[in-house]
């Protein structure tokens, strides 16, 4: 059943014995650069290649289906899994469902479960202040149009190779102790490869050719990764710079309708930063929130429970005059 959420409660309990909130050394910086090249640059090249090949190999319903299907699976993993479940504990579920959500989240290739959660929890702790890994706040990077552009660039992509790594022992201690999640974490690359193999194999089987397999890899693999990646990154940049700010969230988060569908409803950032533990990010009937639609359906099926939602009184109390 759904339950009122405690808006004052943090999403996690920091480890009392762990003093350092961040880790910064040459090894970590090297990993950040490698991750960026492998899972941001290569999908971008793959997307350009897929578009260039349209002249010789027009896209078919198969490629469109693989793109949409793999995008949906990745976004379920990232929006419902990594974000609302693992980072904010907006609902409870079984170990089997948590494993499925974790693997699907890893297919999005934005970091292992523990790393993703640690970065996100630090973002909420320092939202749009010094210490936020990916704020576009121009006050942190300079005023004027150039400061704004630098802020947007930093929040969207610049931070990926240049941020202090949040210490998982501080920000995600319960996940570090979870043996199942730790095993999924260690096999992060396996899940990314699986996310590439599925559309490759399906494309080859459906088309009955190697060309079909390559098309499946390009559209269901690399283009899908590019779309998912930039959709999520747009939340960091555009949804903390443009849009409405109806609630007193103590930061610069904005509600942005333009990327609501591709982000599964994650773009209602002012709502989210005001009620961070809520399973629903879209709080009005017209605020599209595919992630919560799925959670609602899973709750009806008994697959998730204790779904946290703000009451009407809580929402009214946080509205700006």
Swiss-Prot record:
Membrane-spanning segments: 36-56, 62-82, 99-119, 188-208
Motif range (Histidine box-3): 269-273
Up-regulation conditions: Part of the jamaicamide (jam) biosynthetic gene cluster, encoding enzymes catalyzing most or all of jamaicamide biosynthesis.
Subcellular location as annotated: Membrane
Enzyme class: oxidoreductase
Motif Histidine box-1 boundaries: 83-88
Reaction catalyzed: 5-hexenoyl-[ACP] + 2 reduced [2Fe-2S]-[ferredoxin] + O2 + 2 H(+) = 5-hexynoyl-[ACP] + 2 oxidized [2Fe-2S]-[ferredoxin] + 2 H2O; hexanoyl-[ACP] + 2 reduced [2Fe-2S]-[ferredoxin] + O2 + 2 H(+) = 5-hexenoyl-[ACP] + 2 oxidized [2Fe-2S]-[ferredoxin] + 2 H2O
EC identifiers of the protein: 1.14.19.40
Annotated keywords: Fatty acid metabolism, Iron, Lipid metabolism, Membrane, Oxidoreductase, Transmembrane, Transmembrane helix
InterPro entries the UniProt entry points to: Acyl-CoA_DS, FA_desaturase_dom
Membrane topology: Multi-pass membrane protein
Cofactors required: Fe(2+)
Superkingdom per UniProt: Bacteria
GO BP annotations listed: fatty acid metabolic process
Any GO molecular function: oxidoreductase activity, acting on paired donors, with oxidation of a pair of donors resulting in the reduction of molecular oxygen to two molecules of water
Coiled-coil portions: none
Motif Histidine box-2 mapped to chain: 120-124
GO cellular component: membrane
Role according to the record: Desaturase involved in the biosynthesis of jamaicamides, which show sodium channel blocking activity and fish toxicity. Catalyzes the conversion of 5-hexenoyl loaded onto the acyl carrier protein JamC (5-hexenoyl-JamC) to 5-hexynoyl-JamC. Can also catalyze the conversion of hexanoyl-JamC to 5-hexenoyl-JamC, but it cannot use free 5-hexenoic acid, 5-hexenoyl-CoA, 2-hexenoyl-JamC, 3-hexenoyl-JamC or 4-hexenoyl-JamC. Is specific for C(6) chains, and cannot use 4-pentenoyl-JamC, 6-heptenoyl-JamC or 7-octenoyl-JamC as substrate.
Family from the record: Belongs to the fatty acid desaturase type 2 family.
The record's note on its domains: The histidine box domains are involved in binding the catalytic metal ions.
Protein's UniProt name: Hex-5-enoyl-[acyl-carrier protein] acetylenase
Organism, as annotated: Moorena producens (strain JHB)
Source organism phylogeny: Bacteria, Bacillati, Cyanobacteriota, Cyanophyceae, Oscillatoriophycideae
GN (gene name): jamB
């Amino acid at each position: 059943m759904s339950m009122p959420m405690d808006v004052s409660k943090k999403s996690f309990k920091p480890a009392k014995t762990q003093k350092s909130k961040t880790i910064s050394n040459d090894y970590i910086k090297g990993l950040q650069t490698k991750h960026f090249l492998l899972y941001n640059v290569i999908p971008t090249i793959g997307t350009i290649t897929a578009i260039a090949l349209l002249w010789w190999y027009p896209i078919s319903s198969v490629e469109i289906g693989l793109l949409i299907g793999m995008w949906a699976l990745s976004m379920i993993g990232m929006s419902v899994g990594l974000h609302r479940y693992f980072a904010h504990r907006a609902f409870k579920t079984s170990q089997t469902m948590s494993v499925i959500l974790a693997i699907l989240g890893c297919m999005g290739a934005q970091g292992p479960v523990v790393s993703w959660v640690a970065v996100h929890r630090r973002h909420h702790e320092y939202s749009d202040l010094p210490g936020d890994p990916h704020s576009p706040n121009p006050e942190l990077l300079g005023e004027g149009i150039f400061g704004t552009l630098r802020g947007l660039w930093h929040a969207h992509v610049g931070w990926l190779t240049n941020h202090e790594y949040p210490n998982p022992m501080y920000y995600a201690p319960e996940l570090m102790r979870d043996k199942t999640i730790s095993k999924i974490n260690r096999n992060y690359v396996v899940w990314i490869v699986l996310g590439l193999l599925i559309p490759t194999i399906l494309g080859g089987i459906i088309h009955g050719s190697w060309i079909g397999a390559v098309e499946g890899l390009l559209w269901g693999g690399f283009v899908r990764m590019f779309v998912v990646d930039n959709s999520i990154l747009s939340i960091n940049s555009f949804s903390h710079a443009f849009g409405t700010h109806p609630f007193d969230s103590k930061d610069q988060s904005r509600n942005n309708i333009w990327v609501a569908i591709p982000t599964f409803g994650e773009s209602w950032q002012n709502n989210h930063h005001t009620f961070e533990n809520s399973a629903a990010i879209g709080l009005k009937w017209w605020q599209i929130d595919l992630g919560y639609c799925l959670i609602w359906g899973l709750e009806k099926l008994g697959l998730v429970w204790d779904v946290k939602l703000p009451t009407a009184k809580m929402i009214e109390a946080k509205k700006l005059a």
